[in-house]
């Protein structure tokens, strides 16, 4: 797989992703410390022995369910960004597709079958005990050399042989000799990975904290940066929470957080004229969207949210009320807040990292005609500030742990009267129009995916949050 189906010839980055996402910084450190031994064994002693070291350093003691979760939610994004274009051209043209790999099957099978249409995946089988990986492998061991050829024979039951075999190293020759035609994929530094828009199934949702594929050097940099980055994140969060909102923009700038503001935001509502507040309709990138909207305006804007951690409630500088998911209750609550002033809502209901907009809930369009779309986008170089599988309380910390995160807030024109519900448009028409307007501004694609679709894909549930009784609505970090 590495070097054949993928451009990169090293599997270390994918082991590092599993190590960090499941075991955290200390497991990643253990893997980095073990990597010189793995490299020495791989290149000078035995390819199989080197892979065994990586498997042990990564998997020993991990819950198998956690490994499967990372393989489903995290790895596909990184695998898909490294596909070899020429290999994919051959692979996709075949009627039946089988992948033989020395990588653990548990890591690669989900991506290969769901996104590349593989019919069969044969990989190294890891050893398990009471739901945890032991760090060792089952017989016949690592699938390299003769083991790979034997696995292919067993899979095809000696009744037929593959028409085409692709490999990239000498240890692939034994299984390639069993194929009617065999081709070597030679290493070429000039080959660029295939564009992801050519995949048969686009990757709309993915999880995990790391933005870049962690090579050994990048993994070491991440380990060294995390203590420094955490202190920097605490300082940035404290500045946002403690300083008056008009000063937050300048404090962020001094601390390396860039906020770019475009468009002409409306002035605050005047209570003396009985003017109701403006409802800002934002695309949803992280739970910090309302914070950066408030930073751009220089005044705190209340927000409504579905779920947020208690830690985020404590450190938030803006006032927000939780949605109950009861249509009548939520509508009355939003109307009441609009009578008090401006309000921000993210009608997607959950975040999306890729250039897609999820389906907009239409409830907001029924409650007011004072609608201002806001296109939110951000850039992070090291860590993602969102998660579906992990603890959301760390989301703001991971975002602010980036060396120089950037948020771009684009205020669009207020929705014309003739496009509102008051002028006869349906709430769904209004919601869809605003979704298309924001998508066009960001060069994103509109979808009909929802919160349930995201959490089903990434976490295996529908994203429903159980409200704790007696928990008063206070401050939250965003939607």
UniProtKB/Swiss-Prot annotation:
It comes from Petunia hybrida (Petunia). GO terms for molecular function: glycerol-3-phosphate 2-O-acyltransferase activity; glycerol-3-phosphate O-acyltransferase activity; phosphatase activity. It is a multi-pass membrane protein. GO terms for biological process: cutin biosynthetic process; glycerolipid metabolic process; response to symbiotic fungus. A motif (HXXXXD motif) lies at residues 284-289. The chain crosses the membrane at residues 14-34, 37-57, 215-235, 237-257. Pathway: Lipid metabolism; glycerolipid metabolism. Involved in the production of cutin monomers. Esterifies acyl-group from acyl-ACP to the sn-2 position of glycerol-3-phosphate, a step in cutin biosynthesis. Required for colonization of the root by mycorrhizal fungi, and appropriate hyphopodia and arbuscule formation. Cutin monomers act as plant signals that promote colonization by arbuscular mycorrhizal fungi. This signaling function has been recruited by pathogenic oomycetes to facilitate appressoria formation and their own invasion. This is Glycerol-3-phosphate acyltransferase RAM2. Its main location: membrane. Glycans are attached at residue 448. InterPro entries: HAD_RAM2/GPAT1-8 (IPR056462), HAD_sf (IPR023214), Plipid/glycerol_acylTrfase (IPR002123). Belongs to the GPAT/DAPAT family. Disulfide bonds: none annotated. It comes from the Eukaryota. Keywords: Acyltransferase, Glycoprotein, Membrane, Transferase, Transmembrane, Transmembrane helix. It catalyses: sn-glycerol 3-phosphate + an acyl-CoA = a 1-acyl-sn-glycero-3-phosphate + CoA. Induction: Regulated by RAM1 during arbuscular mycorrhiza (AM) formation after inoculation with Rhizophagus irregularis. One of its GO terms (cellular component) is membrane. Its EC number is 2.3.1.15.
């Amino acid at each position: 797989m590495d070097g054949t189906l993928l451009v990169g010839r090293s599997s270390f980055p994918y082991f590092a992703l599993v190590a960090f996402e499941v075991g955290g910084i200390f497991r990643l450190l253990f893997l980095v410390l073990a990597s010189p031994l793995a490299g020495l064994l791989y290149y000078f002693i035995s390819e199989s022995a080197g892979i065994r070291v990586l498997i042990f350093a990564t998997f020993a003691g991990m819950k198998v369910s956690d490994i499967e979760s990372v393989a489903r939610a995290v790895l596909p994004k990184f695998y898909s960004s490294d596909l070899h274009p020429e290999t994919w051209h051959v692979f996709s043209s075949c009627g039946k597709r089988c992948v033989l790999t020395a990588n653990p099957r548990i890591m690669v099978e989900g991506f290969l079958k769901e996104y590349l249409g593989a019919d069969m995946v044969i990989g190294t089988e890891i050893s398990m005990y009471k739901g945890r990986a032991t760090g060792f492998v089952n017989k016949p061991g690592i699938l390299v050399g003769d083991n790979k050829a034997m696995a292919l024979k067993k899979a095809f039951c000696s009744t037929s042989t593959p028409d085409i075999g692709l490999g990239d190293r000498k240890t692939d020759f034994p299984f390639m000799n069993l194929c009617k035609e065999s081709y070597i994929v030679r290493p070429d530094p000039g080959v660029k990975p295939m564009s992801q828009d050519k995949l048969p199934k686009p990757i709309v949702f993915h999880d995990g904290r790391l933005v870049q594929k962690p090579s050994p050097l990048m993994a070491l940099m991440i380990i060294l940066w995390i203590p420094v980055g955490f202190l920097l994140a605490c300082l940035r969060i404290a500045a946002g929470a403690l300083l008056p909102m008009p000063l937050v923009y300048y404090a962020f700038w001094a601390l390396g957080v860039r906020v770019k503001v475009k468009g002409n935001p409306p002035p605050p509502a005047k209570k003396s004229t009985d003017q109701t507040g403006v409802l800002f309709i934002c695309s949803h990138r992280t739970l910090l969207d309302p914070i950066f909207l408030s930073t751009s305006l220089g005044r705190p804007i209340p927000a409504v949210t579905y779920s947020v951690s208690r830690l985020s409630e404590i450190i938030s500088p803006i006032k927000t009320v939780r949605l109950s998911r009861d249509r009548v209750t939520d509508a009355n609550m939003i109307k009441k807040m609009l009578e008090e002033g401006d309000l921000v809502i993210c009608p997607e209901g959950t975040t999306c990292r890729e250039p897609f907009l999820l389906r907009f809930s239409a409830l907001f369009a029924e409650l007011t005609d004072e609608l201002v779309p806001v296109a939110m986008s951000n850039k992070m170089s090291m860590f993602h500030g969102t998660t579906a599988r992990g603890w959301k309380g760390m989301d703001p910390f991971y975002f602010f742990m980036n060396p120089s995160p950037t948020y771009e807030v684009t205020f669009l024109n207020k929705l014309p009267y003739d496009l509102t519900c008051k002028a006869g448009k349906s709430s769904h028409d209004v919601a869809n129009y605003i979704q298309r307007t924001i998508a066009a501004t960001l060069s994103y694609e509109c979808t009909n995916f929802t919160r349930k679709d995201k959490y089903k894909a990434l976490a295996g549930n529908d994203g429903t949050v159980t409200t704790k009784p007696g928990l008063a609505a206070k401050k939250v970090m965003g939607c």
